Every structure is written in C-alpha cells, then in structure tokens.
C-alpha cells in the first residue's frame, strides 16, 4: 500500500469503500477498493485472494483493468484503473424529456457485449451487472467493472452499509433459486440495461424478490414447463404464482426500433439455454449500421 496515496473517497461499492488514489512514483490515478468481508476476524480467505489474482489476467478495452491486489493488516485492497463516471450517473444527468442518442445506445450495448463475451470465453461470470458498475469515459467508451468478484467474495444480500443489493437486473433463474446457473445470467442483466439505455428507466424495478419476479412475469408472462423446461421444479417456484399472459415488452420500451426490440426479446428469453449468447447478440441485425471500426476493441478483433 505504501506505493499508493488516497486522494478522496468516491463511493461505496458492493464490498466496501472505494477511494480515488494515485500511484506515488508513476502518478497514475487509480480506484482503490477496500474489500470488507463478512468473516473479518479470520482475515481474507486465501481462496478469495487466489480468485481475485486471476482477474489481473482479464485484459480487454471494455473491462475495467485490475492493476494490483494488495494486503494491508488483513484488509484486501483492489487497485483498478480509474474512470470518473458510471452509467447510472450519466443516465440521471440526461435532462427530462431527452434521451440518449440511439447510436450511442447501440455502441454502448455492443461494447458491453464485447466485454461480456471476452470474460465468458475465459469462464468468468459477472453475476451482478448493473448501471452502477458500467463505467464510461468522455470518448464514448464503456467498461465493465467488478467482473469476477462475485466468485471470489460471493454476491452479498446487503452492501456493507446495509443498503440492499439491487435485484432489478437479476435473471429469473437466480431469483427462482436455481443452484446451477451460467453465462446467460449476464445476458439477461445486459438486456434489462439495454432497455434502460433506451428509456432511462429501469425495466423491472422490484423492491423484493417476489415483487421483482412478478414485474417480470406481468411483462413477459408467467413461465411454466412448456416455455422453460423444469422451471416448476426450481426451489422458489410456486404453483400458486398468478398466471400472467405477458406480451407488453414493446409497449414498455418505446424508443427501440424493430431490430432493437427483437434483440431485447432474445436477451430476455426465460429458458437460459435458449437465451441469445453475448457472441450471437453481437451479430444481430440491430448492429448492422454500427461502425465497429471506431470501437476500442476493433484493433484486437481485426475489424
């Protein structure tokens, strides 16, 4: 830690306080995340240190770079590249009655998918994607923060400040208690973020797990074994759930064209193996008119 100096506290993340800092000798500005773990007394579990150290290998223009993992008095500090704005703050800053430029929505979504596909290829899930951990710069680049941290530290029910972790972007298989889930959970979250990019409003803003599920069901229909094999045997599925018909997605997301709505619907398919993958989503006709050569990952994709 002696290599870094804290400049100011910039926020409270899922796992602890986040500071803006500077590397003393290079002057590089960084984000310093102090990780608070439930089992504080025993110090940091070695498995968490191992897991998180692997994340230093994730090097992609749309993934916030983990620069260093440091221990100080049984506290873990993660040193990340610094970006000053997150997507939630940006969406909140757009004046009432105005919306994000449709081409920027498209560019941001494509870049998010680039970052997700890169991590999924490396068997790393996010599990907690939301506008607060999508960071942007002033050049139109968006980057995913906190990729892989859920595996190292778990996804807490409450932030260490006792604020409840948001459920708005959580996939239905997670909400229904599925013990096994995989990469489609991140695609679902990205779909809900896609809708929010277009409308500035969260698509499903539940205030409890059951309210969250019911908001999804009202919009997309209550799932059963016909549309999602074995959903009725998931731990938190109840045969007493109201049977909504759904079919109201397009009326809730007015600012998307036909291709955008088609892609969104494919990202929000209930049955996880049938849900579009990040890689498949990137080839969807919605992106046909996006100039991919200007995107930050173009150089590594050979566009």
Curated annotation (Swiss-Prot):
Top enzyme class of this protein?
A: transferase
Which PROSITE patterns does the entry mention?
PROTEIN_KINASE_ATP, PROTEIN_KINASE_DOM, PROTEIN_KINASE_ST
Domain Protein kinase span(s) in chain numbering: 4-287
What does the UniProt record say this protein does?
A: Plays a key role in the control of the eukaryotic cell cycle by modulating the centrosome cycle as well as mitotic onset; promotes G2-M transition via association with multiple interphase cyclins. During G2 and early mitosis, CDC25A/B/C-mediated dephosphorylation activates CDK1/cyclin complexes which phosphorylate several substrates that trigger at least centrosome separation, Golgi dynamics, nuclear envelope breakdown and chromosome condensation.
Q: Which GO terms describe its molecular function?
A: ATP binding; cyclin-dependent protein serine/threonine kinase activity; protein serine kinase activity; RNA polymerase II CTD heptapeptide repeat kinase activity
Family annotation (SUPFAM superfamilies): Protein kinase-like (PK-like)
Q: Which UniProt keywords apply?
A: ATP-binding, Cell cycle, Cell division, Cytoplasm, Cytoskeleton, Kinase, Mitosis, Nucleotide-binding, Nucleus, Phosphoprotein, Serine/threonine-protein kinase, Transferase
The principal localisation class reads: nucleus
How is this protein named in the record? Cyclin-dependent kinase 1
PANTHER family from the xrefs? Answer: CELL DIVISION PROTEIN KINASE (PTHR24056), CYCLIN-DEPENDENT KINASE 1 (PTHR24056:SF334)
Q: What CDD domains does its record include?
A: STKc_CDK1_euk
Instruction: Please summarize the record's notes on activators and inhibitors of this protein.
Output: Phosphorylation at Thr-14 or Tyr-15 inactivates the enzyme, while phosphorylation at Thr-161 activates it.
Q: How does it assemble?
A: Forms a stable but non-covalent complex with cyclin B in mature oocytes.
Q: How is it modified after translation?
A: Phosphorylation at Tyr-15 by wee1 and wee2 inhibits the protein kinase activity and acts negative regulator of entry into mitosis (G2 to M transition).
Organism source for this protein?
Oryzias curvinotus
Which spans of this chain does the record mark as coiled coil?
none
